[in-house]
Each structure stands twice: as structure tokens, then as C-alpha cells.
Swiss-Prot record:
Positions that bind Zn(2+) 3: 150, 153, 164, 167
Span of domain OTU: 425-585
Gene3D superfamilies assigned: 1.25.40.560, Zinc finger, RanBP2-type (4.10.1060.10)
Organism per entry: Xenopus laevis (African clawed frog)
Name this protein carries in UniProt: Ubiquitin thioesterase zranb1-A
Gene: zranb1-a
């Protein structure tokens, strides 16, 4: 027999290994299980063929031996003795209980079927199952369970390998637990059967063929069990980690998620996430816990004890740091009517949803059926000054009020309107996210937020169903606006369509910022004009001018018939990417209102005069006018008078009259405001009593 015939070839790398090797020298792949050794490999003298034939029926190497076969018998090499897998048709060795390729269970053979014998001159194999061959199959099954297949190059690696030895692909985390369980179960069954057969087989065998001491076998099997237990243990640890993370997530509340989103937003530069957490009433000084750091799973960015301020300093977010430090220094809990009365607020939201209808016809735009205008109650003036200050701190946005009044004379710049005509405007506080425009519109009408995105849905559906109408107005207006600034250019229709598709997409995304076109559509949904008082320039947090805002002006529902719309407008304020509702306070209605103010002698009606000119007495722009509607200032003033109840005050200011009535207002809104105001009335007596006592003491002195 030649040397090439004695060696066995590896089925993975084809390397020729020595017969005593149990693994491939090159790739460490296990030796394929086949026939058993039929001669003593360590004899000094070479046996003849006759002795081989005499000893073929009684193998010399028992299950406890670590040696591997040298010469394969004719029985094991006969192809017809193999069984075909019913799943993948692979030919497996007769002793295999599972398919080598797909690990599917061997089909149970019927009593009529019998394996074909080779019919050669060799003696037939005895009917009892050979413990050595049984051991080979079991060993192969264990080895199969100790390996994992690389998903990139399909190479089988050892279980303890962290990455593929061929392509360095990492070990997959999702190990097949079913395969490991089946392998372990099958191995335990074979072990029990093997031990029972080994007791019977070894008792009747010759003393010269007795196996070596079992310490070698036990050590090998212990090593295999350790490898398999390590693989199972690592999977158990992975499952425990997943279970722990799931428990942490189940304990998380909405505020916790907003806090984590704010932390990630600082790292990634997302200001909206920080503002969402801030407006929800979250604690700016909150620190990251160990569970939260584990859930974020970014040790390089997050650490236990970090706050939003720490993260802003670490990642050099100067703009976010300015907002956070301002919030820490001026932290005041907000208390608006919608927060105090959640039950009434939900009923109002249902009323709004029920009042949304779609107009039949060519212009199938959605609209609201009710005319509601929110005003602050006049009873606030009856509260003590300290209580009034507390109320205004909790319901108003002081930063917006200061920017619109002091930094730029945008609102309340006329003493005539603010004092004598009681038309002072107040900026209500709302969420500083992308929904601020929709929130401010509902606050100016119903006094609540667009929490359920009812108004956003109506906005998106109106833009989608009436896309042709709004698209024509938008395209014509954008072209004229660019030319008015001396920008003479033309866009392809594909570019116009892309920009319009972006505007449509913003309307469908909750939290997305909205543009001038969306205000124009909202004016049609409300069926009333919208006046926006805003800053003229975009500015950075350092005060640097970045560009024009283009939001200030009047938005008329030009695509409706005038008879279908109301002439009482609402007012919004715009400051640095944020919209706020501008509302007035109720008045008694019997003061001298100036020239042109007709109150119909109804004391219950509150009239607020909204200026249609800026502080320089220039007429506000009317957005989205067509070429036929564009004209000089007199023509635009005429158009404003057609769509709104306008008058000129004694000071010569052109104003639009916003009329509201507590008696005609929606009863749910009235109940909500009264319940909110009762909370401040309850703290009035103590303060009033102490002030009265001090006044009496002063008089006595």
C-alpha cells in the first residue's frame, strides 16, 4: 500500500493528512467519519492480507480510543449502502442519523427495506451495531454542533472562533438555539445507548483487544462538552441581555423616551428633539442613569451622570447650550387651559374633528364649520397683581413677547391700539416643535393644541385633493416674488414639481416644519383670513442675519367665494422658526372705539383691532395673489376691505376688526377657561387679605 493510499484527504481543503490525525493539519477541520480501523496502527510488523481478513470482523480500536481509521472497508465505501436525504438528496453514510448537509432527521426505514450488501469476498458485517461506528456518528454529530457556518464564505468555523478564519467575518449573534438543543438531545441519547452497548460489547471481547484506559476518552468528551457549553452559555448571556433591555424599555415612560431622544439629538445636532423634551416639561438637570446609558449603547458619547448641559458642552453645541441655560435660569412651569382640563380638552378635540368637512365640487377643500375665536378672560384683571404676574408667566411666552415688542416693534407698537382701544396682543406659549404653526392656529381659535393632528390631516388632504389649485397659485406667486427682488430665472417644470412634492411631504409628516403655502391652505380650512406678524430676518443664536423670513403678511382664502368665508381674522406671531398665537383680552365693549368702529351696541362682543400696516405705516403684504389681483397699494387695500371688516382709527391706522363673543363662543371652550381661571382665584384671598391688612396698618400709622 502506497503512502498516498494510507493518508486521508480533507474534504474542505483537500490536504493529505497522516492516518493518525483526527483533524486536518491545515484547516483544523474534523476528519470525516467513515469506516473503523481494521488493523493495529502501532504494530511494528506489517500484517498480511490474511490477517487483515481475519480481523476485519473484530475491530481493534474501541469507542474509547482516540485513533482514527486507516483503511476503509469495502462495506463503508459501497455507494449503494448510503441513504439519500429526502430534503436535499445528499448521500449520507448508513450510520448517520441526520443528514450531513441540512441536518434533517433520517427517514424511518420500513420493515420491507433492507440495505444492499456489497456481495464481495469480504465477510459480512455482524448484525449487532458496532460500538466503534456508533461512536463515530456520535462524534460527528457533536462536532457538527460545535461549529458555525460563515454567512459570507460558508466556511465552517469552530464554536469558540470570534470571526471566520478565512474572511474575518464576525460571528453571527443569532445562533440557532434549536439546532444546539437538538444536537445536545441527540448526543445524550447516543451516549446512553453507547454506554449500554459498550458494557455488553467489551465484556465479550478478547483481552488483547481491550481498549486503553478511559481517561483519554473522558478528557476528549469533557473538552467537547466545554466547547458546546460555552456556545450555549454565550447565547444564554445574549438572551439575558435582551431580556434585561426589554425590561428597561417596558419601564420607560414617554418623558423618559423624550429625554433619551434629547440626548441623542444633542450628539447628532437635532435641535427639535431637545425642544420637544423641554416643552413637555422635562427636567433640564436630569442625569443619565446606568440603565439609560445601557439602552443608548454608545459608551463613547454617553456616560452615567451626564445631563443635557454636559452633552452640549462636550459636543460643542453652542446653540443648544444657550437654550438649555436660558431654560435653567428662567425655569417656570407652564399652565395653559388645555393642560388643566384634560377631559374638556378631549371633548373639544372631538368637536373639532366632527366639524371638519369637505366641500363638494371642483375645489374639494376641507373646512371647519364653526367660527370660534379664543380670548383671555377679562376676569384676569380682577386678580391681585402678584397672581396676574404668575398667571401671565405660566400662560404666555415671555421670550416671544419680548422679541415682538421690544427687540423689533412688530406688535403693540401703537399706543392708540394698545391702551385706548384695548387691542393689546398676548403671545400664548405652545410646543416649540414642528407642530407650532398648527398649535398656534388652534390656540387662536379653540385654545388647545393640535395633539391628535386633526388639523394636519385636513391640511394634507386639502393639499392632495386640491393640488392643482394650490400649485398654480404657489408657482405664480414664487415666480413674481423672485422677480420682485431682481432674481430673473426660470425653472423647468420638473424642478417645480420636485419643490411642490416637498411641500406636500411636509404636510404629511407629524413634527415637520411648515411654510407659507401651508398657512395659505390653513386660511381656506378656517374660512377666515390669517394675519402673521413676524420678524423680517432669520438670525442665528449669535444675532447674525441669515436671510429673509417672508412669513409676515396677510393670507386670504382667495380660492373660496367671499360669501362662504368669515371676515374676522386671527393673528399669529413668528419669531426665529417658531409660531405663536396672538390673542387679545376680553373688553367690556362700551369704550369709544375710534372712527369706523361699529360694535352694533352689543356689550357682549369683544372687538380687537389688528393693524394691517407695520410700525413704518407700510401696508402688509398679501400673499399668493394672482396676476389679475396684483396692483398698487390702493388696489390691495381695497382687496383687504372686501375680505375683512376694516376701518381707520383716529390715529390713521388701517386695522381689521376681530370680533368675538363669550356668549356666542363654544360652551366647552368657556368651561375650560373658567376651570383654568378658578385655580388662580383660589390663591387670591390669602394674598388679598395680607395686602389689605398692610394697607390698614399703613392708614393707622
Amino acid at each position: 500500500m502506497t503512502e498516498h493510499g494510507i493518508k486521508w484527504g480533507c474534504e474542505y481543503c483537500t490536504y493529505e493528512n497522516w492516518p493518525s490525525a483526527i483533524k486536518c493539519t491545515m484547516c483544523r477541520a474534523p476528519r470525516p467519519s467513515g469506516a473503523i480501523i481494521t488493523e493495529e496502527p502501532f504494530k511494528n510488523s506489517t500484517p498480511d492480507v490474511g490477517s487483515m481478513e481475519r480481523d476485519i470482523g473484530s475491530p481493534l480500536i474501541c469507542p474509547d480510543s482516540s485513533a482514527r481509521p486507516r483503511v476503509k472497508s469495502s462495506y463503508s465505501m459501497e455507494p449503494s449502502s448510503k441513504w439519500s436525504c429526502q430534503i436535499c438528496t445528499y448521500l449520507n453514510w448508513p450510520r448517520a442519523i441526520r443528514c450531513t448537509q441540512c441536518l434533517s432527521q433520517r427517514r424511518t426505514r420500513s420493515p420491507t427495506e433492507s440495505p444492499q450488501s456489497s456481495g464481495s469476498g469480504l465477510r459480512s458485517i455482524p448484525s449487532p451495531i458496532d460500538p466503534c461506528e456508533e461512536y463515530n456518528d456520535r462524534n460527528k454529530l457533536n462536532i457538527k454542533g460545535q461549529h458555525w457556518t460563515c454567512s459570507a464564505c460558508t466556511y465552517e468555523n469552530c464554536a469558540k472562533a470570534k470571526k471566520c478564519v478565512v474572511c474575518d467575518h464576525p460571528t453571527p449573534n443569532n445562533m440557532d438555539a434549536i439546532e444546539l438543543a437538538n444536537t445536545d438531545e441527540a448526543s445524550s441519547i447516543i451516549n446512553e445507548q453507547d454506554r449500554a452497548r459498550w458494557r455488553g460489547g467489551c465484556s465479550s471481547s478478547n483481552s488483547q483487544r481491550r481498549s486503553p484506559p478511559t481517561s483519554k476518552r473522558d478528557s476528549d468528551m469533557d473538552f467537547q462538552r466545554i466547547e458546546l457549553a460555552g456556545a450555549v452559555g454565550s447565547k444564554e448571556e445574549f438572551e439575558l441581555d435582551l431580556k434585561k433591555l426589554k425590561q428597561i424599555k417596558n419601564r420607560m415612560r414617554k418623558t423618559d423616551w423624550l429625554f433619551l431622544n434629547a440626548c441623542v439629538g444633542i450628539v447628532e445636532g437635532d435641535l427639535s428633539a431637545v425642544e420637544s423634551y423641554k416643552t413637555s416639561g422635562g427636567d433640564i438637570a436630569r442625569q443619565l442613569s446606568a440603565d439609560e446609558v445601557r439602552l443608548l449603547n454608545r459608551p463613547s458619547a454617553f456616560d452615567v451622570g451626564y445631563t443635557l448641559v454636559h452633552l452640549s458642552i462636550r459636543f460643542q453645541r453652542q446653540d443648544m447650550l444657550a437654550i438649555l441655560l436660558t431654560e435653567v435660569s428662567q425655569h417656570a412651569a407652564k399652565c395653559i387651559p388645555a393642560m388643566v382640563c384634560p377631559e374638556l380638552t378631549e371633548q373639544i378635540r372631538r368637536e373639532i374633528a366632527a366639524s371638519v368637512h369637505q366641500r363638494k365640487g371642483d375645489f374639494a377643500c376641507y373646512f371647519l364649520t364653526d367660527l370660534v375665536t379664543f380670548t383671555l378672560p377679562a376676569d384676569i384683571e380682577d386678580l391681585p397683581p402678584t397672581v396676574q404676574e404668575k398667571l401671565f408667566d405660566e400662560v404666555l411666552d415671555r421670550d416671544v413677547q419680548k422679541e415682538l415688542e421690544e427687540e423689533s416693534p412688530i406688535i403693540n407698537w401703537s399706543l392708540e391700539l394698545g391702551t385706548r382701544l384695548d387691542s393689546r396682543l398676548y403671545a400664548l406659549w405652545n410646543r416649540t416643535a414642528g407642530d407650532c404653526l398648527l398649535d398656534s392656529v388652534l390656540q387662536a381659535t379653540w385654545g388647545i393644541y393640535d395633539k391628535d393632528s386633526v388639523l394636519r390631516k385636513a391640511l394634507h388632504d386639502s393639499l392632495h385633493d386640491c393640488s392643482h389649485w394650490f400649485y398654480s397659485r404657489w408657482k405664480e406667486w414664487e415666480s413674481w416674488y423672485s422677480q420682485s427682488f431682481g432674481l430673473h430665472f426660470s425653472l423647468r417644470e420638473e424642478q417645480w414639481q420636485e419643490d411642490w412634492a416637498f411641500i406636500l411631504s411636509l404636510a404629511s409628516q407629524p413634527g415637520a416644519s411648515l411654510e407659507q403655502t401651508h398657512i395659505f391652505v390653513l386660511a381656506h380650512i378656517l374660512r377666515r383670513p390669517i394675519i402673521v406678524y413676524g420678524v423680517k430676518y432669520y438670525k442665528s443664536f449669535r444675532g447674525e442675519t441669515l436671510g429673509y423670513t417672508r412669513f409676515q403678511g396677510v393670507y386670504l382664502p382667495l380660492l373660496w367665494e367671499q360669501s362662504f368665508c368669515w371676515k374676522s381674522p386671527i393673528a399669529l406671531g413668528y419669531t426665529r422658526g417658531h409660531f405663536s398665537a396672538l390673542v387679545a383680552m376680553e373688553n367690556d365693549g362700551f369704550d369709544n372705539r375710534g372712527a369706523g368702529a361699529n360694535l352694533n351696541t352689543d356689550d357682549d362682543i369683544t372687538v380687537t383691532f389688528l393693524p394691517l400696516v407695520d410700525s413704518e405705516r407700510k401696508l402688509l403684504h398679501i400673499h399668493f395673489l394672482s396676476a389679475q389681483e396684483l396692483g398698487n397699494e390702493d388696489q390691495q387695500e381695497k382687496l383687504l376691505r372686501e375680505w375683512m371688516d376694516c376701518c381707520v382709527t383716529e390715529g390713521g391706522v388701517l386695522v381689521a376688526m376681530q370680533k368675538s363673543s363669550r356668549r356666542r363662543n363654544h360652551p366647552l371652550v368657556t368651561q375650560m377657561v373658567e376651570k383654568w381661571l378658578d385655580g388662580y382665584r383660589q390663591i387670591r384671598p390669602c394674598t388679598a387679605l395680607s395686602d389689605g391688612e398692610e394697607d390698614e396698618d399703613d392708614e393707622d400709622e
